[in-house]
């Protein structure tokens, strides 16, 4: 799968000379996979009696007695419904002379799975200050990590952080060197520089770096000192730390002692300095309330240069949050800062004025377009109406001078203008309607330090679960929430993507009407409808979905600004219309100058026209990865979006974005069969971009509509359309007859409006189009 380069970093060739002090040379690092070692959370040793079981006999199991340092243990278990059940198990008492001593510690949640167990070197570090306690204070852990690091390692630690911070500033500053740059990222650059200075000062203060040492670190990039040169000091270093043998049993798999009295002895344990640096940096950022999206990106970058992958860093981050007492953990809880209804009400108030202006413009435009076309074709329409009246025996009305005179033209023009204004106003009101349904639905909510927000592109029905496409995401990556927005709109999105078939049905209806009494009338009305297409352009469901996705994205930005999901970094993932929601969320965050929220963004099949200045602003909000997944032969997205947008611009979901540094482009043509397959292919796509997934299969995702059900839906469609044709014809004829004081008898009416005949005509259309008709519809 081709992945385009995110672009080169700029070091000193910046348009603003004041930015040169924050530029750093490009640093390339190789990411290596960390090994997964089983944690020392539960250390058990099996003992059997010497004479009861033969050494080579594995036929029967013998009862095994255990000894515990505590009289009881609370063992957390998880049932099929993911509900934690606490079960208290009594410990059997045995004599010390019969068994060797052992110590058991039970971990929570998914730590029982070896994949989710913390690295043994990281456990050593945390268990130094634990001493068997459930939680560790932040101050005590910071004191321990500070004592472990030597002066040389502290300098290397500070230098690595400073060079990586300069590299992050350089990522935004590089935008200013683009030839078409016009100051779009000025606010983002200023905010990033402020964060860089504040974070660097906190690290210097914590490590006790002197003024002279600070000057030396600030000039490292000028002397061609690379990050790899400093990271080697930290990667190869180990520090011996004296801990109790109780903790040593937990973290170093030392040999068992002969008695319980040996647990009080002291012995040294080798500590990996890499985990010491990560733990120290994370706690410093948390303690100073600096842990935003940029700080987490810095933590991941430090882990990368220390040869620790993001998955291991996420496990370590989770373990620290769970075991260390952090004063402001309440900020990690969702909904702690804002009320959803209040934010939605505020957004409605802001968009109301713009909505009324657009409705007025649509009404004026609709009246002009339909009024003018009706006036130009008034003679033809009058002739058609006269021919229709002649068909039903109203020759007097057909030959009257009114239809042939100027009065009929004025009446038809006025009626067209009034109906056009009504169509334009109501269509725009529907298109610019406020978001009525918006909700964060949790998939995994365990108070992690980061949160992932997923946005679906459509639903199979209003009762569909928007979390299904992302259900296989590994919960270790963070708290996961899915946005439940406008279910009616999402349920109809799949139908709007079949607009080609809608056009075919429209043509078939015209053929059916052509075989009835209103031949001349429909022939005259066909041209003004084709010329205007106003109802199609304004009230088309696809256009409504696009506008509602934009409004939802703005509302999502409001929610994130008010910290509805807590004060923590946010990663956004979406496909199809969900990707459009995320794009306009980024645009709104840039307008609000909120650059501390979004860490990573992953978009797939985005129905957004590419405009480089707009996408540059959206990219300036993202501190980490910005991934654009596209499918080159997505004909559904190409036809629908380009048709409704007049073919202007280029669709991001169909091509790569290669003129903005920092955006990664991934071609998913070989991974996704079509646009409608994005929903069930999300586990595969997430794994392709680097997410940890529990399973790439789509068992948890609902299957497509079966073929028999599709045929039944097609048959129902024909019947509904036939009834609509019948009702429209009946209403027109009865209205004309009422003006003359006449009416059709029920018997003649039933014979005249035979829905069975209309249904047969529709079936002929189906037979004419054959299999191509069904394939285009579905």
Curated annotation (Swiss-Prot):
<dbReference type="GO" id="GO:0000139">
    <property type="term" value="C:Golgi membrane"/>
</dbReference>
<dbReference type="GO" id="GO:0016787">
    <property type="term" value="F:hydrolase activity"/>
</dbReference>
<feature type="transmembrane region" description="Helical">
    <location>
        <begin position="356"/>
        <end position="381"/>
    </location>
</feature>
<keyword id="KW-0472">Membrane</keyword>
<keyword id="KW-0812">Transmembrane</keyword>
<feature type="compositionally biased region" description="Polar residues">
    <location>
        <begin position="41"/>
        <end position="51"/>
    </location>
</feature>
<dbReference type="InterPro" id="IPR007941">
    <property type="entry name" value="DUF726"/>
</dbReference>
<dbReference type="GO" id="GO:0005794">
    <property type="term" value="C:Golgi apparatus"/>
</dbReference>
<dbReference type="InterPro" id="IPR029058">
    <property type="entry name" value="AB_hydrolase_fold"/>
</dbReference>
<dbReference type="Pfam" id="PF05277">
    <property type="entry name" value="DUF726"/>
</dbReference>
<dbReference type="GO" id="GO:0035652">
    <property type="term" value="P:clathrin-coated vesicle cargo loading"/>
</dbReference>
<feature type="transmembrane region" description="Helical">
    <location>
        <begin position="401"/>
        <end position="423"/>
    </location>
</feature>
<feature type="compositionally biased region" description="Polar residues">
    <location>
        <begin position="18"/>
        <end position="34"/>
    </location>
</feature>
<protein>
    <recommendedName>
        <fullName>Uncharacterized membrane protein C6F6.13c</fullName>
    </recommendedName>
</protein>
<feature type="compositionally biased region" description="Polar residues">
    <location>
        <begin position="1"/>
        <end position="11"/>
    </location>
</feature>
<comment type="similarity">
    <text>Belongs to the TMCO4 family.</text>
</comment>
<keyword id="KW-0333">Golgi apparatus</keyword>
<feature type="region of interest" description="Disordered">
    <location>
        <begin position="1"/>
        <end position="60"/>
    </location>
</feature>
<keyword id="KW-1133">Transmembrane helix</keyword>
<dbReference type="GO" id="GO:0005737">
    <property type="term" value="C:cytoplasm"/>
</dbReference>
<dbReference type="GO" id="GO:0035650">
    <property type="term" value="F:AP-1 adaptor complex binding"/>
</dbReference>
């Amino acid at each position: 799968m081709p992945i385009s380069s995110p672009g080169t970093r700029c070091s000193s060739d910046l348009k603003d000379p004041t930015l040169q002090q924050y530029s750093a040379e490009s640093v390339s690092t190789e990411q290596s996979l960390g090994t997964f070692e089983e944690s020392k959370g539960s250390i058990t040793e099996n003992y059997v009696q010497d004479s009861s079981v033969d050494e080579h006999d594995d036929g029967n199991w013998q009862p095994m007695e255990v000894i515990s340092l505590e009289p009881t243990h609370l063992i957390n278990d998880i049932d099929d419904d993911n509900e934690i059940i606490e079960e208290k198990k009594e410990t059997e008492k045995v004599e010390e002379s019969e068994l060797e001593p052992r110590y058991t510690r039970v971990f929570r949640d998914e730590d029982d799975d070896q994949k989710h167990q913390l690295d043994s070197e990281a456990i050593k570090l945390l268990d130094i200050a634990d001493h068997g306690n459930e939680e560790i204070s932040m101050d005590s852990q910071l004191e321990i990590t500070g004592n472990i690091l030597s002066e040389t390692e502290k300098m290397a630690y500070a230098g690595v952080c400073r060079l990586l911070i300069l590299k992050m500033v350089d990522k935004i500053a590089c935008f200013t060197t683009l030839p078409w740059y016009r100051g779009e990222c000025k606010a983002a650059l200023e905010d990033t520089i402020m964060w860089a200075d504040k974070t660097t000062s906190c690290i210097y203060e914590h490590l006790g770096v002197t003024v002279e040492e600070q000057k030396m670190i600030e000039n490292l990039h000028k002397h061609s000192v690379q990050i790899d040169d400093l990271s080697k000091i930290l990667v190869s270093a180990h520090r011996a730390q004296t801990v109790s043998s109780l903790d040593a049993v937990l973290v170093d798999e030392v040999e068992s002692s002969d008695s319980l009295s040996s647990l009080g002895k002291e012995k040294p344990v080798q500590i990996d300095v890499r985990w010491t640096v990560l733990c120290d940096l994370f706690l410093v950022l948390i303690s100073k309330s600096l842990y935003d999206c940029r700080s987490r990106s810095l933590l991941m970058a430090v882990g990368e240069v220390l040869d620790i992958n993001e998955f291991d860093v996420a496990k370590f981050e989770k373990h620290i949050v769970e075991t260390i007492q952090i004063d402001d953990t309440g900020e990690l809880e969702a909904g702690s800062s804002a009320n959803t209804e209040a934010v939605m009400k505020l957004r409605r108030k802001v968009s109301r004025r713009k909505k009324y202006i657009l409705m007025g413009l649509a009404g004026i435009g609709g009246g002009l377009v339909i009024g003018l076309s009706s006036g130009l074709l008034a003679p033809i329409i009058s002739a058609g109406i006269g021919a229709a009246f002649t068909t039903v025996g109203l020759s007097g009305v057909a030959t009257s001078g009114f239809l042939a005179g100027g009065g009929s033209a004025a009446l038809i023009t006025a009626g067209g203008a009034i109906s056009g204004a009504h169509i334009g106003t109501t269509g725009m009101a529907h298109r610019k309607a406020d978001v009525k349904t918006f909700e964060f639905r949790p998939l995994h909510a365990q108070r992690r330090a980061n949160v992932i927000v997923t946005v679906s592109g459509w639903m199979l029905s209003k009762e569909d679960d928007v979390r299904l496409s992302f259900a296989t995401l590994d919960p270790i990556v963070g708290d996961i929430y899915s946005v439940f927005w406008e279910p009616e709109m999402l349920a109809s999105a799949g139908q709007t993507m079949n607009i080609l078939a809608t056009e075919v049905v429209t043509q078939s209806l015209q053929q059916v009407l052509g075989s009835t009494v209103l031949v001349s009338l429909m022939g005259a009305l066909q041209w003004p409808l084709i010329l205007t297409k106003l109802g199609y352009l304004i009230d088309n469901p696809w256009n409504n979905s696009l506008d509602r996705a934009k409004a939802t994205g703005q509302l999502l930005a409001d929610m994130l600004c008010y910290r509805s999901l807590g004060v923590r970094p946010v990663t956004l993932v979406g496909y199809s219309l969900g990707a459009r929601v995320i794009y306009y969320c980024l645009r709104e965050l840039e307008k609000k100058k909120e650059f501390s929220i979004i860490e990573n963004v992953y978009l797939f099949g985005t129905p957004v026209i590419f405009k480089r200045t707009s996408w540059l602003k959206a990219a300036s909000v993202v501190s980490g990865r910005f991934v654009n997944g596209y499918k080159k032969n997505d004909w559904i997205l190409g036809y629908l979006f380009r048709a409704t947008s007049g073919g202007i611009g280029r669709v991001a979901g169909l091509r790569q974005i290669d003129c903005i540094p920092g955006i990664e482009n991934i071609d998913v043509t070989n991974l996704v069969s079509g646009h409608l397959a994005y929903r069930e292919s999300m586990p595969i796509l997430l794994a392709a971009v680097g997410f940890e997934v529990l399973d790439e299969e789509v068992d948890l995702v609902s299957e497509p509509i079966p073929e028999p059900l599709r045929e039944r839906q097609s048959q129902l469609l024909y019947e509904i359309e036939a009834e609509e044709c019948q009702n429209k014809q009946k209403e027109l004829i009865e209205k004309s007859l009422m003006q003359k004081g006449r009416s059709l008898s029920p018997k003649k009416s039933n014979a005249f409006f035979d829905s069975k005949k209309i249904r047969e005509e529709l079936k002929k259309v189906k037979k004419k189009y054959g299999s191509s008709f069904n394939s285009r519809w579905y």
